[in-house]
Amino acid sequence: MVAPMKGQVCVVTGASRGIGRGIALQLCKAGATVYITGRHLDTLRATAQEAQSLGGRCVPVVCDSSQESEVKSLFEQVDREQKGRLDVLVNNAYAGVQAILNTTNKSFWEVPASIWDDINNVGLRGHYLCSVYGARLMVPAGKGLIVIVSSPGGLQHMFNVPYGVGKAACDRLAADCAHELRRHGVSYVSLWPGLVQTEMVKEFMAKEDTPEDPLFKKMKPDFSSAESPEMSGKCVVALATDPNILNLSGKVLPSCDLARRYGLKDIDGRPVKDYFSLGYALSQVSSLGWLNSFLPGFLRVPKWVVTLYNSKF
């Protein structure tokens, strides 16, 4: 089996389950040594065992990304054990999913203000902490890739206010860090997965009391064709092995765009749903949905249209 990342060292935060787990599995399958973090050693060990069965090496490390001392200790361990080498950092840890699911039909003033910290202490501040300590290993080597897992929630309202603000900040974090890292040969990108069939979302969709929930109604039409968590992993492997990755640094990279760029399909062979196709865009407008079946898949909404539509000026 080809191992394009053999010898490379990676860190994936929040890899006990969901997207982080999927990324860790694919990085190990590509032959890398992968440090995975989470707050519970038992689930980390389960992920590590499965990942190592695919190839590579997986090292579970208990680390709360909201605690700088624990983040610092994580990267000191990588530095010590890998002689200063770090090739890929994936900022994925996120502690806000349950808070989002519990408040889907409420406005920001109707929920405790502490939801801001529930969502963004790990999902934004934690990413910055990891970026700081990860960059300190990458910059001296003159190479490396940092990926932050974000979403279109940074463009327009999705779920709630703290979520959208946090995701917009993640995209800006990638852009500004990329600006400062470029001269050192280190890339930083923002990855936008599509709708993903994570364990927690599957549980939410399976509950008997959710059919009338507005979030359930929003996700139901696309959930059966949603991406597997490992699709994000395939995207990260493709980026990490791209010799021209610096050309993409600072950019927002939707998984459907990366699937087209690198010829990727999901782990079960399914094509990745293209949320930027013209057909999909029209399907979201009730009076125009019928046009979808007549449009070829290669017709896409230009990025400048997306930018203009979401412009704040």
From Swiss-Prot:
Q: Which residues does the annotation say bind substrate?
A: 151
Catalysed conversion reaction: 17alpha-estradiol + NADP(+) = estrone + NADPH + H(+); testosterone + NADP(+) = androst-4-ene-3,17-dione + NADPH + H(+); prostaglandin E1 + NADPH + H(+) = prostaglandin F1 + NADP(+); isatin + NADPH + H(+) = 3-hydroxyindolin-2-one + NADP(+)
One GO cellular component, as annotated: mitochondrial inner membrane
GO MF, one example: oxidoreductase activity, acting on the CH-OH group of donors, NAD or NADP as acceptor
Q: Which UniProt keyword terms apply here?
A: Endoplasmic reticulum, Methylation, NAD, Oxidoreductase
Class of this enzyme: oxidoreductase
SUPFAM superfamilies, sorted: NAD(P)-binding Rossmann-fold domains (SSF51735)
User: According to the UniProt entry, which residues carry Omega-N-methylarginine?
Assistant: 21
Where, by residue number, is the active site?
Answer: 163
The entry marks the following residues as binding NAD(+), namely 19, 64, 163, 167, 198
The record's subcellular location field reads: Endoplasmic reticulum
Gene3D superfamilies according to UniProt: NAD(P)-binding Rossmann-like Domain (3.40.50.720)
Give the EC number. 1.1.1.-
Q: Which Pfam families match?
A: adh_short
Summarize the protein's role. Answer: NADPH-dependent oxidoreductase which catalyzes the reduction of some steroids (estrone, androstene-3,17-dione and cortisone) as well as prostaglandin E1, isatin and xenobiotics in vitro. May have a role in steroid and/or xenobiotic metabolism.
Domain topic, free-text comment: May be attached to the ER membrane by its C-terminus segment.
Among PANTHER family, the record links this protein to: DEHYDROGENASE/REDUCTASE SDR FAMILY MEMBER 1 (PTHR44147), DEHYDROGENASE_REDUCTASE SDR FAMILY MEMBER 1 (PTHR44147:SF2)
The record's comment on protein family reads: Belongs to the short-chain dehydrogenases/reductases (SDR) family.
Q: What is this protein called?
A: Dehydrogenase/reductase SDR family member 1
Organism, scientific name: Mus musculus
